[in-house]
A protein has these predicted regions:
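FMN-binding flavodoxin-like domain, especially the glycine-rich phosphate-binding loop
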Residues: 1-7, 14-41, 46-197
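Iron-sulfur cluster-binding cysteine motifs and their immediate structural context
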Residues: 200-201
Length: 201
């Protein structure tokens, strides 16, 4: 299997998800890499449908162990035609809970065939100098791992007879997806935090 184009579709309020997705794409080494930033609502334009010759990276941070509600509707509009895909979640050094499973399910529902899936650590959006959480991540080692992950995917696809043969049958996570007991309290508290990442101007 040869991949002509890698399209990275990413939601990245703090920029770290974008960086990790880009390094994965570099590792895959396709002739063309397209970066689609869907962080701001104004940038969420129709994208696709994608073909079998494409490879799509879907990348997002983890909020409360889930995919951010903000980006769920847009990801659900993406359509593949048996297109290989790589769901990627980025979390702040605690747990990613059911986020990877949720993103995997979104991809499958959209006609994509996940050939790999990854979870990477980045500095938490609530990290402060007084209370650092995964400070300065991803670091050089993290980025090397992300690029190596992409290289491994390229090698896997090169020896696979078909997309179906390369497709993952499952990823870590559960259904129904986790619902934090204090989710509403968290959302209310988050509104008052000045360093909460913005997703639009």
């Amino acid at each position: 299997m040869n991949i002509d184009t890698v399209t990275c579709i990413f939601f990245s309020p703090t920029g770290t998800t974008k960086i990790l997705a880009e390094h994965i794409a570099r590792g895959i080494g396709a002739g063309r890499i397209e970066m689609v930033d869907c962080t701001k609502r104004s940038d969420r334009k129709k994208c696709g449908p994608f073909s079998k010759g494409d490879l799509v990276i879907l990348a997002t941070p983890v909020y409360y162990g889930r995919i951010p509600e903000e980006i769920l509707p847009y990801f659900a509009t993406l359509k593949g035609l048996q297109t290989p895909a790589i769901p990627v979640v980025v979390y702040g050094n605690r747990e990613y809970d059911d986020a990877l499973k949720e993103l995997y399910d979104i991809a499958v529902a959209g006609g994509f065939l996940p050939v790999a899936a990854g979870a990477f650590i980045a500095q938490h959006s609530y990290s402060t100098p007084d209370r650092p959480i995964a400070e300065a991540r991803p670091d050089a080692n993290d980025l090397n791992k992300a690029q190596a992950f992409g290289t491994d995917i390229r090698k896997k696809l090169a020896v696979s007879e078909s997309i179906d043969a390369a497709t993952l049958s499952k990823v870590p996570g559960n259904v129904p997806y986790v619902v934090p007991k204090n989710l509403n309290l968290i959302k209310e508290a988050r509104k008052s935090i000045p360093f909460t990442p913005e997703t639009d101007e």
